[in-house]
Design a protein with these regions (language model features):
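Helix-coil boundary and interhelical linker segments in multi-pass alpha-helical membrane proteins
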Residues: 1-4, 55-66, 106-115, 155-157
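N-terminal topogenic module of multi-pass integral membrane proteins
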Residues: 1-61
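C-terminal TM-helix exit segments that contain a strictly Trp-centered aromatic cap at the helix terminus
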Residues: 14-19, 81-83, 152
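Membrane-proximal helix-loop-helix units in multi-pass membrane proteins
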Residues: 65-119
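Juxtamembrane "helix-exit" motif on the non-cytosolic side of transmembrane helices
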Residues: 57-61, 80-87, 127-132, 154-156
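Alpha-helical transmembrane segments of polytopic membrane proteins
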Residues: 5-7, 37-49, 94-101, 115-120, ...
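Terminal transmembrane helical module of multi-pass membrane proteins
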Residues: 112-157
Length: 157
């Protein structure tokens, strides 16, 4: 039952991305939504909430818990420092985004390697068909692999 809130927030994140893409065009990366919405804090707040809701679930599921922690804290810092074009926030944002993606992927590999393989294949196909938004597709696939791994492990438990 604890997985309902994180999955709801994940679905909300995808909905916000889809609505933004429909109205403004597909962003080159998820973080671009912050600037595209006039520096609205909606997406950063959702990312922080998503990270904090996934943390206890990921820790309970096992795997390498330090990777689960780094994944969620990285995503929380991405949301906490959304102004990646600002000199003061750029290094925090960029480092946190890289940390969240790498740690999330490694955590998923320790839990459900097949999910990572499918997500990587999807990212490659999306990147080849939409080269301008390659980073966006990699981010969506990385975030989705974590969500799918959480759902699969929760249902299997």
């Amino acid at each position: 039952m604890m997985v309902v809130c994180p999955i709801f927030l994940y679905a909300l994140t995808l909905l916000l991305i889809a609505l933004y893409s429909r109205n403004m065009g597909r962003p080159t990366m998820i973080s671009e939504i912050y600037y595209g919405t006039g520096r609205s804090f909606m997406m950063p707040c959702v990312l922080v909430a998503l990270a904090l809701s996934f943390l206890p679930v990921m820790l309970d599921l096992g795997g390498q818990q330090w990777l689960a922690f780094l994944t969620c804290m990285g995503l929380a810092f991405v949301g906490a420092a959304p102004a990646y074009l600002s000199q003061g926030e750029r290094s925090v944002h960029k480092g946190a985004a890289i940390l969240a993606s790498v740690a999330g992927t490694l955590w998923c590999i320790t839990m459900e390697p097949c999910v990572v393989a499918v997500a990587a294949l999807m990212a490659i196909i999306a990147t080849l068909t939409d080269r301008r938004c390659w980073l966006f597709w990699c981010e969506v696939c990385a975030m989705s692999s974590v969500a799918v791994t959480v759902v699969l492990k929760t249902l299997g438990a």
